[in-house]
Amino acid sequence: MNPQIRNPMKAMYPGTFYFQFKNLWEANDRNETWLCFTVEGIKRRSVVSWKTGVFRNQVDSETHCHAERCFLSWFCDDILSPNTNYQVTWYTSWSPCPECAGEVAEFLARHSNVNLTIFTARLYYFQDTDYQEGLRSLSQEGVAVKIMDYKDFKYCWENFVYNDDEPFKPWKGLKYNFRFLKRRLQEILE
């Protein structure tokens, strides 16, 4: 798809995780989307491969690519096979913009062998109807879109962060913000 797209990173640093994934309603100065992923390749009901990694937006003179597009480019070029079913799970710092949501929905419509679940820390411009429609288009294409809760943040910390065996430390307001964002997402997807 795009030869300038970098391969996924193995993990991120703790400060990056706490800054980028904090589930605030309004998250000023968080201008990047980080996407942690797992890909399970399934043949005859058995997991035959397992990939994990981290993408972030690539914004430079050569490439302007949101994290979702980076993932799709890598996945199509390096992983995707018509003879394998895939369960893909994303943990994102922001929900997709309308353009990325549309591209992902179109990709899934063309590849019935790929199932996607998205856990997101925050909803991007959730008051904007275009962004709401993007989330609905994903849901209509069979994507389970969910708000990250404590166990999801902990999972990301344990699997996608260079954590030096330190435990995940939840921030003040995590549970309250989760409830608020979950209600907003339910309203959008109704």
UniProtKB/Swiss-Prot annotation:
Pfam families in the cross-refs: NAD2
Cofactor: Zn(2+)
A GO biological-process term: innate immune response
InterPro entries: APOBEC/CMP_deaminase_Zn-bd, APOBEC_Cyt_Deaminase, CMP_dCMP_dom, Cytidine_deaminase-like
EC number: 3.5.4.38
Membrane-spanning ranges: none
Domain CMP/dCMP-type deaminase, chain residue ranges per copy: 29-138
Location (main, coarse): nucleus
Domain of life: Eukaryota
Residue ranges of coiled coil: none
Residues where Zn(2+) binds: H66, C97, C100
Compartment(s) where it occurs, according to its Swiss-Prot or TrEMBL record: Nucleus; Cytoplasm
Hydrolase as UniProt keyword: yes
Family per record: Belongs to the cytidine and deoxycytidylate deaminase family.
Subunit structure: Homodimer. Interacts with TRIB3.
Name the record gives this protein: DNA dC->dU-editing enzyme APOBEC-3C
